A protein has these predicted regions:
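Active-site recognition of the HExxH zinc-binding catalytic motif
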Residues: 79-92
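Metalloprotease/metallohydrolase-associated module, dominated by Zn2+-dependent proteases
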Residues: 2-63, 67-71, 92-184
Length: 187
């Protein structure tokens, strides 16, 4: 089996996963964002409110996966990506799913995320943002033979501890969902 140890291959692999998630959980309704792999202190990923990338004359959102978080179990990477895709889905429909400068995830976010095989728990500061994959999402990953990513940036900081699964799943690290500020707001 090939191993994901090269950055360029990881980028392509994340695009493949995004396409599979878009098909399964959004009926291909999401506009394709540009996937980036950058440092995201205190977060596993983010999506931009604005369309900050130009690609072949088309403006596109950015969906970032934290460079220092790539060696988490693949189901956690998938849960982070799906979390950010829910923000994109809500954004495309004009649904405000965050407040307090884009940091507090409200029940509109929670409701859409739980429809898509994510377990969403409440955080006292950031709202409905603590994200773990459900058993169904873990099975989705297994059914598609998704493999672990084996390249990671050493960021020198620690992310929040795991909340663990509530439905018999292994203890898994949560997605904070906090994003960097882009323009006037952030998700």
């Amino acid at each position: 089996m090939k191993q994901l140890t090269e950055y360029n291959r990881v980028s392509g692999y994340l695009n493949k996963i995004l396409a599979l998630l878009n098909e399964t959980y959004f009926e291909n309704a999401l506009s394709k964002p540009v996937i980036t792999i950058q440092s995201t202190p205190r977060a596993y990923g983010h999506v931009t409110v604005g369309k900050v990338w130009d690609s072949d004359g088309e403006r596109r959102h950015e969906l970032n996966i934290g460079a220092g978080t790539l060696t988490r179990p693949i189901e956690n990477i998938v849960a982070t990506m799906l979390h950010e895709m829910v923000h994109l889905y809500n954004l495309q429909r004009g649904v405000q799913d965050c407040s307090r400068g884009g940091t507090y995830h409200n029940t509109k976010f929670r409701d859409e995320a739980t429809k898509r095989d994510l377990l969403i728990e409440h955080h006292k500061t950031y709202g409905w943002t603590l994200t773990t994959p459900t058993d169904n999402l873990i099975m989705w990953c297994l059914d598609r033979d998704l493999i672990e990513i084996q390249v990671n940036r050493n960021e020198g900081y620690n992310l929040p501890p795991s909340t663990g699964g509530k439905n018999g799943t292994p203890t898994i690290t949560p997605t904070t969902g906090k994003a960097k500020k882009i323009g006037r707001a952030h998700v």
